[in-house]
Amino acid sequence: LMRSSAASDVYKRQIYYLVLCALVACTTASCKDSNDDYIPPALEPEKPEVPVEPEDPRADVPIHVDGEPYTTYKGLLMTGYQGWFGTPGDGCSHANHKNTEWYHYRENDMFKPGVLRNSIDLWPDMSEYEIKYDTEFKYPDGTAQVYSAYDKSTVMLHFKWMQEYGIDGAFMQRFVGEVIDNPDGKDHFDKVLASAMDGSDQYQRAIAVMYDLGGYNPARFEKVVADAQAIYDTYASKRKYYLHENGKPLIALWGVGFNPAERGYSNEDIQKLSDKLKEVGYSIMLGVSTYWRAGGGDTYTPGRASLHALIKSVDVIMPWYVGRFNDINSYNTGGSDGGFANMVGKDIEWCKNVNESGESKVQYAPHCYPGASDLNMHPYYERGSRERGKFFWTQLHNCIRRGCTMLYIAMFDEIDEGTAIYKVLRKSDVPSNAADVEYYVVYNPKNEKISYSDMNGIGRSTENTVFMAKNKVTAPTDGWCKSEKELGITFEGIDDDLETDYYLWLTGQAGKMLRKQIALQETQPKR
């Protein structure tokens, strides 16, 4: 009886277990999703964030096709070409006069070692010139030589360099005070211009004429128009590579917006000249004062309304900056608008606004320069540092990143004010500038009347700002009297570890950056 009871208990437990399993199975079945075949997707791995490329602020500009005419300044990097250096024996009528034979090399009618006895601060690298002229300057191993722009081979070499280094062309400087009523000056600049036109043809460089209005006055209106008409008939309307803008040959007038009492002409005078040159068939570019937009500084503020009216009537403007800043800090902080760098942006914006409003079609060509130095002419100035090209590149990068469509570089060959980009000697290679006589230099900033003995020992008096004296004189108010040796002014060379063509190369790189052929870069490129 007891065994039967135990078996019964086992049987009950088995039944209970089976019922429990059945209940669990039913519950699971009732809760199961009807989509028995569903397989959840695999988790995708996280993708790294792709950095967003900053928008390129550069303007879209046309790319000139080799061998085609230059129909617009847009997309071009142009340089100013002085072409004003001459020498004894070069064939120019300047060489017939002792006081002008060393044309633009001279200071105080001579070209000799010593401050105020020559006008240049850089010395050209003469290794590639076909015709060379001996000077009184000496290297440790021989006589230093220079060139004359009156020689065609010299100008052709310069245009060859423009092609080799990617400089699009040149504005040929034509100085009113040197070509109007001045047969010797006209002889020189006519010959240089003719050579440059041939250089433009051979090396396919853009070319245009820029009148420097120094020496202009209303009485010379007809003579300047006649000169411009002759250039139009001979070159501008016929040469394949003469630069055009808005369908017409471009001619530039430099020196607009300054004080008329100092310049000898007003904005209204230049408006009249500009309008007449349009009738000849030209489009017009103006070289204007730095502060043309807002007034002040070098700009004649009472004439700002007439200046703006003149600007709106032309095709291109180019403000002048040489001497307004001499290092990167003053470029970024000086001037108005919180720095010259910002002024460029504001200038571009002003031109854009008047174009969009329909008031004008004027384009803006910012001006950049590699540095400046003219101590042999002005020993009371400071010599700016090129900072191995950083000073130059800072300006170029700023103008391009702010959306400029064209550039003007000052200057190709200006060794007298130290702005030249062509091949010049390094610091350790320049000739000596030590004078062979003793004399004093007097700085007279208030233009007081000073008595002194000239270099020949003759007693004289002068109110000049700076002059040479045989003997020491009492220093003028706020000025000084120093010996030539004490001043110790040497020629300025480029850095010894740079090639003599470095600034030609750097300028060419800026042209590529303007056209988006290389990246926009704040740091100057390495060669």
Range-by-range predicted roles:
Residues 1-14:
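Single conserved hydrophobic/aromatic residue that forms the stacking wall/gate
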Residues 17-26:
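Bacterial N-terminal signal peptides
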Residues 26-60:
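Bacterial Sec-dependent N-terminal signal peptides
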Residues 51-527:
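Glycan-processing catalytic domains of CAZymes
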